[in-house]
């Protein structure tokens, strides 16, 4: 579909492409997903029939970190200021990074569809795309919270980021998503999401 003008909308930012290559989602065949980037049977990729089985035990684990997001959006210059605060809830060994992303909902663009029960086939020209990754504010792999090999309970990492929104990003439909992960195995400890306009 890359050369098909019907699918001109590009939903593949640099970070998304890098993650797809590293974790192997497209290579395994869609649909699939990652759950906290946990590896199951030496694979990050988990198929829909296993999502609940993998996610339910993870939801029962105590939080290792908390993330607080505070946004300030300037309508006049289309600029977001977001403060990300990560507070660790226990002593943990490892080096950790934080990634800050922008996602967008309510984007109407063509989507391939083989199921007439959910929409027109073979292409749904008015499909509503949600949770579309628009990009990151601190690179594809984020920034180190700690490189000492350990973080202590109640240790806090805080940083403020700025970004000017392109005209195609609709602030009322966008969210800031932040997550902290273990750099060695890429597993996510905690994530948070709030609207850009809150």
Describe the function of each predicted region.
Residues 1-198:
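Short, conserved sequence motifs used for protein processing/export or organelle targeting and
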